[in-house]
A protein has these predicted regions:
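Substrate-binding/catalytic subdomain of NAD(P)-dependent oxidoreductase enzymes
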Residues: 1-39, 44-46
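Active-site proximal loops enriched in glycine and acidic residues that flank catalytic Cys/His/Asp
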Residues: 13-14, 28, 51, 61-63, ...
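Active-site lining segments that contact anionic ligands and/or coordinate catalytic metals
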Residues: 21-23, 44-46, 54, 105-109, ...
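Low-complexity, glycine/alanine/valine/leucine- and proline-rich hydrophobic stretches
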Residues: 27-52, 66-67, 128-140
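Short, glycine-/Ser/Thr-/acidic-enriched flexible segments
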Residues: 31-32, 53-55, 63-66, 115-117, ...
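ATP-dependent carboxylate/acyl-activation modules
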Residues: 39-88, 98-105
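A conserved regulatory-domain signal marking ACT and ACT-like small-molecule sensing domains
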Residues: 77-178
Length: 178
């Protein structure tokens, strides 16, 4: 389905600073095929940083993979928690507010596996102001694909949770990055 939308699904680490706090997560994202991230394959990694004055810059290279990467990330997290880096230069004693859900409105791709397609499609259409449900040419009669536009992640999850028996259904939520 991502291909039909002109993109590919990648597991992306996202971090964004807001006045009120920081959002950080690793989640599946539909990336445009025109993005440099869409061409990163196998053991290679890429980081894109966007700054106010420099715009967007990208770093690309081979990752360490598996255990070396995991242990390096773990060590970095422990150092940050223990504040062992140079105090004042990169870190200070200020406590950061961490958002578990993306605090701004975004577009989301949803995939739901259900025996009750018609009922769930009706619920989705009632719950969201702007939604597009793909009902034709789907891969399976038991799956629903939809794009929900302009929703905060927390609101999206709460609305989906209000669908009867949603906890029993296999639901995948993917950030749609244009």
């Amino acid at each position: 389905m991502a291909n039909k939308l002109g993109g590919v699904i990648k597991l992306i680490g996202i971090s964004e600073k807001f006045k009120e706090g920081i959002y950080t997560a690793v989640k599946p994202v539909i990336i445009s095929k025109n993005s440099i991230l869409s061409r990163v394959e196998n053991e290679f990694n890429s980081i894109i940083i966007e700054g106010d004055s420099i715009g967007e810059i990208a770093f690309y290279g081979k990752g360490a993979g598996k255990l070396p990467t995991a242990s390096a990330i773990y060590a970095d997290i422990i150092n940050i928690i223990n504040n062992k880096k140079e105090k004042g230069l990169l870190f200070n004693d200020e406590k950061a507010v961490i958002f578990r859900e993306f605090p701004k409105e975004k577009d989301w791709f949803i995939r739901i596996s259900t025996e009750y397609r018609t009922e769930v499609i009706c619920d989705i259409n009632k719950l969201f102001k702007k939604v597009y449900v793909y009902s034709k040419n789907c891969f399976s009669k038991k799956e629903i694909f939809a794009i929900v536009y302009n929703e905060k992640e927390k609101d999206l999850k709460n609305k989906l949770d209000s669908i009867p028996n949603i906890k029993k259904l296999k639901t995948t939520i993917i950030l749609f990055h244009s």
